């Protein structure tokens, strides 16, 4: 048997003692009925001229057809303007992070000699290129490329299968281990070499404390919640660290062949009907789920921090409703109305922010990595020539612009590597073999154009 507390009985007695024996009037209900009747009357009055006008326009088929054509033209123009607006906005949203990632890589390559020294190779590229024979070196680079692409293909298919069968915990654990390695071990190596290069003295406890704070905040921002800009900064940083590892441990010829092969693989994996990346994107769209933030750079919130803010706001409003003074009905009504208005405003603000968040453009971290590998290799192997590095940088941005243009036209997921990498390879070899010797000849003869 459930029994109310004594305080609740007292409140009920006080509440009932305030009510008279007569049936109270219901002004709010009657006013609402009158208001609705007035609205219906005014609505009918306003609609009468329109109905007569429509009756007059029905015989005139040309006028109605012209109006329909004008409305369709207006809608098409608005869609084109919206596409151009958000297309330009998306270009700017991607130019900044891609540029920052490449700048970090190039600055590190130019200043820290550790990442240009060849003292080992990746396990995925077992064939060495330390030979004078061009044919043997080319063969080894092709074999290394085949092994590397095969590993990427197998791991991608494995990831797609895990996602298809909803093995989310395994995927999260896999990504968390990768992020831990990047944010702690690779960051330690990077900071150690930077401090050695610039002769900065730091004791190990302080260094470990810095790395611990950096890695812990990064894990929280990437895999849980955090400010959008901080999450983006961490994604850019781990992409740069991974690119530096590839630049150091990939053989020179193998790196260029891998860049060409990975662009072809990206094209097939995204556009083929049974491509692994296409299946991953389609599965995520069917389930209406975001792809894991550790794999995708997003210019909009994926696990939005607004969710926490809205939950906090809802909690505050619930607390306001729970702390209503039941002894004052007028104050209770006003507080409930204020809470309802606040909730409506919060929902309207969230709904107004949702379209911008949905329009955010997303780019895979692999694209960041291979863009930076291309520019970093150009900076490391082009005899320190800035013309070649800048040419590759411009080529990647041009390819990214064209990719975003195609994205606005086709409105579906497209590979971001083929155009940019193709332009980058063309600009690299043409600048390194044609422009650089020409500039050196002009400089040796003290001729300036």
Curated annotation (Swiss-Prot):
Taken from the record's topology, the Lumenal segments are 112-141, 191-203, 248-252, 384-389
Q: Could you tell me which regions are intramembrane?
A: 415-435
- Give UniProt keywords alphabetically: Endoplasmic reticulum, Glycoprotein, Golgi apparatus, Hydrolase, Membrane, Notch signaling pathway, Protease, Transmembrane, Transmembrane helix
Position of sequence motif PAL: 415-417
- Membrane-spanning residues where? 91-111, 142-162, 170-190, 204-224, 227-247, 253-273, 363-383, 390-410
Give yes or no: UniProt keyword Protease. yes
Q: In which tissues is it expressed?
A: Highest expression in ovaries and to a lesser extent in kidney, brain, eye and lung. Weak expression in testis, intestine, liver and heart. Present in trace amounts in skeletal muscle.
Polar residues composition-biased segments: 50-63
Active-site feature positions: 266, 367
Region annotated Disordered sits at 1-75
| Cited SMART domains | PSN
**EC supergroup of this enzyme:** hydrolase
Give the location in the cell.
Endoplasmic reticulum membrane; Golgi apparatus membrane
Question: Which purpose does this protein serve, as stated in its record?
Answer: Probable catalytic subunit of the gamma-secretase complex, an endoprotease complex that catalyzes the intramembrane cleavage of integral membrane proteins such as Notch receptors. May play a role in negative regulation of apoptotic cascades during oogenesis and embryogenesis, and in developmentally matured tissues such as brain tissue.
Instruction: State what protein this is by name.
Output: Presenilin-2
Task: Name the species this protein comes from.
Answer: Xenopus laevis (African clawed frog)
